[in-house]
């Protein structure tokens, strides 16, 4: 296979356009929101089920496309998605958002911090795209998070509550990582310092304090006191949002976020010295343990002893890792990260990108075979793949090549 030049901005821009074309215009449900389930060829295979993670990520996708391509159809699609979040997912009595819906009615009313992070990301990205009516919704979401989810003691967010705001004892890194991402987007949209300060607090507490309890890496699962729970989901290691084992993709995703923090704070001359070495450590360890030297690509998970415990190849792991490699290359100047960027893109282009219909396949076996023809079930939306491309394009426009 002939590979394009992944250091050419136009290549990434075209890749975003073809990925958006997989979803548009078929993703738009005229009766409200977006369809969430797609076969490889784009056929919608469940028209009535909705998931908060997809509902929010489709807003992100369309708002980002509106910024990049200056096309009013994307702004209208983003507004269409925001209306569904406000009118259908959101419970005006509690302020919470339904996790899943069936036929426009709440199915699972659990309040997940992970979902709230994407609500804030959706509102923030919409504001960046010029949808200024979403600005007060950012404030509303901050207040909801402060009231119910944030724990000042550990300086992290609680994970999940029922519809009446009774919280479980589970604590997790995944929600806090995506909350850090959302806070960075909120800061970009508003220039309100509280968002940047909170993003730094979350990053510090997860990648330094909590990582110090888990071999210097970010473990996924904790008890109510933020002690490491080494056994959570050990019997269900492929759980969609709470898998067992160290997640290489989350180490590299944190590395990406640390580099964004470094750039924002560095512009003020206030970037903590630990950001770059911590990001490098997380990325380097992830690739050391999880890169598949035989079949290529980054494995999904590795155990505390360093052995691979889940050798599947997930789309988002590769996407987040190539974005992290680009930002590490930009910040450090170390040529090894540019090499990783090229290597991960080459693998992804050959095996995960669907050059016939567009977008990325979701998951492959270790030897790069598909499991099924469900390219994009609820939660995917190719937010990770396009988000990574946007991040790299931004680095290129700052001068990275």
Predicted regions and their residues:
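Glycan-recognition and catalytic cores of secretory/periplasmic carbohydrate-active enzymes
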Residues: 1-401
């Amino acid at each position: 296979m002939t590979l394009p030049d992944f250091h050419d901005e136009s290549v990434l821009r075209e890749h975003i356009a073809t990925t958006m074309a997989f979803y548009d215009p078929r993703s738009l449900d005229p009766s409200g929101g977006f369809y969430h389930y797609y076969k490889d060829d784009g056929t919608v295979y469940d028209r009535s089920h909705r998931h908060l993670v997809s509902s929010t990520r489709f807003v992100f996708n369309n708002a980002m496309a509106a910024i990049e391509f200056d096309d009013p159809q994307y702004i209208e699609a983003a507004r269409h998605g925001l209306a569904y979040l406000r009118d259908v997912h959101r419970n005006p009595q509690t302020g919470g958002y339904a996790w899943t819906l069936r036929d426009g009615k709440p199915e699972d009313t659990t309040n997940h911090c992970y979902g709230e992070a994407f609500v804030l990301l959706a509102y923030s990205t919409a504001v960046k795209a010029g949808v200024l009516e979403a600005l007060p919704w950012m404030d509303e979401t901050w207040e909801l998070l402060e009231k119910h989810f944030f724990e000042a003691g550990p300086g992290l967010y609680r994970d999940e509550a029922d519809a009446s705001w009774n919280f479980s004892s589970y604590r997790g890194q995944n929600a806090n990582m995506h909350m850090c991402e959302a806070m960075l987007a909120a800061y970009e949209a508003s220039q309100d310092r509280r968002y940047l300060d909170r993003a730094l607090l979350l990053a510090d507490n997860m990648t330094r304090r909590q990582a110090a309890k888990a071999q210097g890496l970010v473990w996924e699962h904790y008890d109510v006191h933020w002690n490491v729970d080494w056994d959570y989901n050990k019997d269900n290691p492929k759980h969609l949002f709470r898998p067992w084992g160290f997640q290489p993709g989350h180490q590299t995703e944190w590395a990406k976020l640390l580099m964004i923090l470094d750039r924002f704070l560095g512009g003020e001359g206030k970037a903590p010295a630990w950001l770059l070495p911590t990001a490098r450590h997380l990325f380097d360890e992830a690739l050391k343990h999880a890169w598949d030297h035989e079949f290529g690509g980054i494995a999904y998970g590795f155990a505390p002893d360093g052995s691979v415990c889940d050798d599947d190849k997930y789309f988002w792991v590769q996407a987040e890792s190539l974005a992290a490699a680009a930002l590490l290359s930009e910040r450090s100047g170390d040529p090894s990260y540019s090499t990783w960027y090229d290597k991960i893109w080459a693998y992804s282009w050959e095996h995960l990108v669907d050059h016939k219909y567009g977008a990325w396949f979701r998951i492959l076996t270790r030897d790069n075979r598909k499991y099924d023809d469900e390219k994009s079930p609820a939660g995917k939306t190719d937010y990770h793949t396009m988000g990574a491309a946007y991040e790299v394009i931004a680095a290129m426009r700052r001068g990275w090549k």
